[in-house]
């Protein structure tokens, strides 16, 4: 992990993508749904010049479609050895249609988890 870049920019299926650990410009802070608006997320995509922003850091899943594209956080499979919360989730983002499927390791196989909005 040490050798991975802090940020990555590229394209998949004709869609421009920006990935970072936290939020663009600051990998020590994350995007929490109750602290961000769709307008702010749309502005982030516009300022980055991308269709898709993939983030992490919070260990909580996030999927938001906005006018410009979408913002995704798949959550985390990591288990902490303290009281910190983690989601035990991972996700699959399909491009170019920007659909996102979230999988939860704590839910029995075959059971659906609630979709993110």
Per-region residue spans from a language model:
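N-terminal start-of-chain detector that recognizes signal peptides
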Residues: 25-26, 42-46, 62-66, 72-74
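Conserved catalytic scaffold of divalent metal-dependent phosphoesterases
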Residues: 1-52
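Short solvent-exposed loop/turn micro-motifs enriched in small/polar/acidic residues
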Residues: 1-3, 55-57, 84-86
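Acidic, His/Gly-rich catalytic cores of divalent-metal-dependent hydrolytic chemistry
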Residues: 64-117
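Active-site environment of divalent metal-dependent phosphoester hydrolases
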Residues: 25-27, 52-65, 79-82
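Short, acidic/polar N-cap/turn motifs at the starts of alpha helices
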Residues: 5-9, 60-61, 88-90
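Active-site neighborhood of phospho(di)ester-bond hydrolases with catalytic His/Asp-centered motifs
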Residues: 19-20, 51-57, 71-75
């Amino acid at each position: 992990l040490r050798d991975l870049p802090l940020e990555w920019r590229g394209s998949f299926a004709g869609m421009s993508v920006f990935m970072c650990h936290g939020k663009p410009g600051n990998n020590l802070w994350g995007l929490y749904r109750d602290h961000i608006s769709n307008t702010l997320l749309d502005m982030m995509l516009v300022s980055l010049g991308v269709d898709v922003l993939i983030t992490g850091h919070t260990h909580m899943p996030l999927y938001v479609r906005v006018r410009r594209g979408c913002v995704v956080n798949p959550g985390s499979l990591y288990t902490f050895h303290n009281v910190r919360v983690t989601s035990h989730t991972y996700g699959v983002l399909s491009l170019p249609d920007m659909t996102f499927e979230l999988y939860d390791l704590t839910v029995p196989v075959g059971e659906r988890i609630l979709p993110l909005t």
